Amino acid sequence: MDRKVAVPEDGPPVVSWLPEEGEKLDQEGEDQVKDRGQWTNKMEFVLSVAGEIIGLGNVWRFPYLCYKNGGGAFFIPYFIFFFTCGIPVFFLEVALGQYTSQGSVTAWRKICPLLQGIGLASVVIESYLNIYYIIILAWALFYLFSSFTSELPWTTCTNTWNTEHCMDFLNHSGARTATSSENFTSPVMEFWERRVLGITSGIHDLGALRWELALCLLLAWLICYFCIWKGVKTTGKVVYFTATFPYLMLVILLIRGITLPGAYQGVIYYLKPDLLRLKDPQVWMDAGTQIFFSFAICQGCLTALGSYNKYHNNCYRDSIALCFLNSATSFAAGFVVFSILGFMAQEQGLPISEVAESGPGLAFIAFPKAVTMMPLSQLWSCLFFIMLIFLGLDSQFVCVECLVTASMDMFPSQLRKSGRRELLILAIAVFCYLAGLFLVTEGGMYIFQLFDYYASSGICLLFLAMFEVICISWVYGADRFYDNIEDMIGYRPWPLVKISWLFLTPGLCLATFLFSLSQYTPLKYNNIYVYPPWGYSIGWFLALSSMICVPLFVIITLLKTRGSFKKRLRQLTTPDPSLPQPKQHLYLDGGTSQDCGPSPTKEGLIVGEKETHL
């Protein structure tokens, strides 16, 4: 390989790497990369990642955690984890995908074959997410369709599904006494449990299939399929709408929320700092797990999306911007949620602690109840559930896309052919839909809670995050990875990122992981229903099935490799030689930088080709 310098008439000298005579480029490899596809532009990548990480948790989990854990004081542990775990691991996964141009499994296999189980574990978590996360979209679609009525069906107690215990608060506020309130239920709760879920007495009784929910689930899967069936070329176009539309809805709901009576009191409850809460280790655990949940860390999605970037894309700048965007969205969503909860508390004459909810309880009980108290309630109901649908939709189809990417990179000769991608997505969609039918039975809510509590729990994500940063910083080498990043973006990231990879992130993850185990409490539905022992066994199977991949594949790869233990260990911790190596740049002042070989660009390296921090 020879370095040649050309001096154009109207520009600076250009330095490129060209093959010497007789030296051939790997045409087959180029075709494979070309077939794999890339983002058309940076905005498609940014919006796709934003769509993945900014989801339902920003609206229904973060505001409640902030209120529950000391209001404004919660931001102290939150931002400690944000800078020491969130940004470093987020950037690590995106940079890994961009550097290797591979999905989650093959990226880790190329970096360190011994720890390829990290990628397989993320695929297991992705698979679980694809089965149960989309159920929320089915519920939201059901509520959206139910909102197109002259009167919202969860407003009154005169419907066929209501019981004699139903009490409409708005029309009978003076009829209920303190001694009898426990015997009554609200029309909102009865609509949720009796009309939507048809919930049974426990997981032992799954009951019949809720056909309306099954059809809503089918519609959700059809939308997801056609959003991604042609690869990143279609996904990149769809996210222009799906990732930005929720922000429009959020702004509209924010304006409406802060103009409601009682909104100010709700916001005060949301932000009022209680520094004494920082003494509680649970507050710190909630902050850490929220970072991992909301940043989609250890799910393989960031690696897969980063793998479609151009080699010299400034993924460092993108990662920092996306992390701040995610947290800012969570913060803004808190104003929407608590302004409306404050209004609802004032209307009912209740303390805000009695109306504050998180998770599905906020989306399908608290907020529907709030809109019944507003003028034009059907309009606000439609806007809210449309926002929920779009928040969940792009997270869902990006998650499916990442599973498809991982599969195609693992078996390129079989799957990267004409028409195979569409069939693979169809197979995944059909399988996940059929599996999801168990979650839209009358007892499906109990199964959904098991998936949500165990399959993608904070324990699983913390466990994988520890191995990710240990693999990159201690096995592959933090300095070596910094060299690779410098080769891609043109400069070395802030030293705190490397310090976090080496010490802070694994230390905090380990401490939070151990504390999570010590504070483990078995799942209870609505804090009342206790699962049978076999139900908890299913939950722990869901949790351990991902975590076991890491040690299991360490053992398998060691047993399959020949030679002494030391030789096998050295071989299995050696990166794939096909990975791009940092190259020697010729600078305009005649100096050179330390380097080893060409990077995988199609036209050669040109001075000024990289994005810079400027």
Swiss-Prot record:
<dbReference type="GO" id="GO:0005886">
    <property type="term" value="C:plasma membrane"/>
</dbReference>
<feature type="disulfide bond">
    <location>
        <begin position="157"/>
        <end position="166"/>
    </location>
</feature>
<feature type="transmembrane region" description="Helical; Name=7">
    <location>
        <begin position="320"/>
        <end position="341"/>
    </location>
</feature>
<dbReference type="GO" id="GO:0035725">
    <property type="term" value="P:sodium ion transmembrane transport"/>
</dbReference>
<comment type="similarity">
    <text>Belongs to the sodium:neurotransmitter symporter (SNF) (TC 2.A.22) family. SLC6A12 subfamily.</text>
</comment>
<dbReference type="GO" id="GO:0031460">
    <property type="term" value="P:glycine betaine transport"/>
</dbReference>
<keyword id="KW-0472">Membrane</keyword>
<feature type="transmembrane region" description="Helical; Name=2">
    <location>
        <begin position="73"/>
        <end position="92"/>
    </location>
</feature>
<protein>
    <recommendedName>
        <fullName>Sodium- and chloride-dependent betaine transporter</fullName>
    </recommendedName>
</protein>
<dbReference type="GO" id="GO:0042995">
    <property type="term" value="C:cell projection"/>
</dbReference>
<keyword id="KW-0532">Neurotransmitter transport</keyword>
<feature type="glycosylation site" description="N-linked (GlcNAc...) asparagine">
    <location>
        <position position="183"/>
    </location>
</feature>
<comment type="subunit">
    <text>Interacts with LIN7C.</text>
</comment>
<feature type="transmembrane region" description="Helical; Name=12">
    <location>
        <begin position="538"/>
        <end position="556"/>
    </location>
</feature>
<feature type="topological domain" description="Cytoplasmic">
    <location>
        <begin position="1"/>
        <end position="44"/>
    </location>
</feature>
<feature type="transmembrane region" description="Helical; Name=5">
    <location>
        <begin position="238"/>
        <end position="255"/>
    </location>
</feature>
<keyword id="KW-1133">Transmembrane helix</keyword>
<keyword id="KW-0325">Glycoprotein</keyword>
<feature type="transmembrane region" description="Helical; Name=11">
    <location>
        <begin position="499"/>
        <end position="518"/>
    </location>
</feature>
<dbReference type="GO" id="GO:0005332">
    <property type="term" value="F:gamma-aminobutyric acid:sodium:chloride symporter activity"/>
</dbReference>
<feature type="compositionally biased region" description="Basic and acidic residues">
    <location>
        <begin position="21"/>
        <end position="33"/>
    </location>
</feature>
<feature type="transmembrane region" description="Helical; Name=1">
    <location>
        <begin position="45"/>
        <end position="65"/>
    </location>
</feature>
<dbReference type="InterPro" id="IPR000175">
    <property type="entry name" value="Na/ntran_symport"/>
</dbReference>
<keyword id="KW-0813">Transport</keyword>
<dbReference type="InterPro" id="IPR037272">
    <property type="entry name" value="SNS_sf"/>
</dbReference>
<dbReference type="Pfam" id="PF00209">
    <property type="entry name" value="SNF"/>
</dbReference>
<dbReference type="GO" id="GO:0006865">
    <property type="term" value="P:amino acid transport"/>
</dbReference>
<keyword id="KW-0769">Symport</keyword>
<feature type="topological domain" description="Extracellular">
    <location>
        <begin position="138"/>
        <end position="210"/>
    </location>
</feature>
<keyword id="KW-1003">Cell membrane</keyword>
<dbReference type="GO" id="GO:0015812">
    <property type="term" value="P:gamma-aminobutyric acid transport"/>
</dbReference>
<comment type="function">
    <text>Transporter that mediates cellular uptake of betaine and GABA in a sodium- and chloride-dependent process. May have a role in regulation of GABAergic transmission in the brain through the reuptake of GABA into presynaptic terminals, as well as in osmotic regulation. Probably also involved in renal and hepatic osmotic regulation.</text>
</comment>
<feature type="transmembrane region" description="Helical; Name=9">
    <location>
        <begin position="423"/>
        <end position="441"/>
    </location>
</feature>
<feature type="region of interest" description="Disordered">
    <location>
        <begin position="1"/>
        <end position="33"/>
    </location>
</feature>
<feature type="transmembrane region" description="Helical; Name=3">
    <location>
        <begin position="117"/>
        <end position="137"/>
    </location>
</feature>
<feature type="glycosylation site" description="N-linked (GlcNAc...) asparagine">
    <location>
        <position position="171"/>
    </location>
</feature>
<feature type="transmembrane region" description="Helical; Name=10">
    <location>
        <begin position="458"/>
        <end position="478"/>
    </location>
</feature>
<keyword id="KW-1015">Disulfide bond</keyword>
<dbReference type="InterPro" id="IPR002983">
    <property type="entry name" value="Na/ntran_symport_betaine"/>
</dbReference>
<dbReference type="GO" id="GO:0006836">
    <property type="term" value="P:neurotransmitter transport"/>
</dbReference>
<keyword id="KW-0812">Transmembrane</keyword>
<feature type="transmembrane region" description="Helical; Name=8">
    <location>
        <begin position="374"/>
        <end position="393"/>
    </location>
</feature>
